[in-house]
Amino acid sequence: MKRVVITGSGTINSIGQNILQTMGSLKEGRCGISDLIFKDVERLSVKIGGQIHDFEPDKHYNRQQLSLYDRYTQLTLLAGKQAIQQSGLSFGGEIAESTGVILGTAGGGVSTWDD
C-alpha cells in the first residue's frame, strides 16, 4: 500500500473565494444559502441554494480561456491552483508522475449540459 499525503486544498464557494475566507466565514457562523439568481430559476421547485457570487473570471483567465471554459471549469481550475500554491510543491520530474487530484462537486458542469 502506498502512502497518501494531502499537501494542499482549495475552494471557491458561497461563503469564501479561498480556504482562508471560507474558514473565517465558518467561524463567524455565516450562512451561504440565499435566493438563487440565474436565468430560468422559476423552473426549479427549490429556489434557494449556496450560489457563488462575486467571482470575476476575467481576473483569472484570458479571453481565449474564457471562451473555452464553462463556469464549473473556471472554478475547478482556480481551486486546483489554490491547492497547488498551498502545497508549496513544484510539480516536475518524479513528483509529477506520482501526483493525483481528488475533486468533489455537488453537480458541477450542469450549466454546460443545459446549454
Walk through the language-model features, giving the residues of each.
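Conserved "HGTGT" condensation-loop signature of ketosynthase/thiolase-family condensing enzymes
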Residues: M1-D115
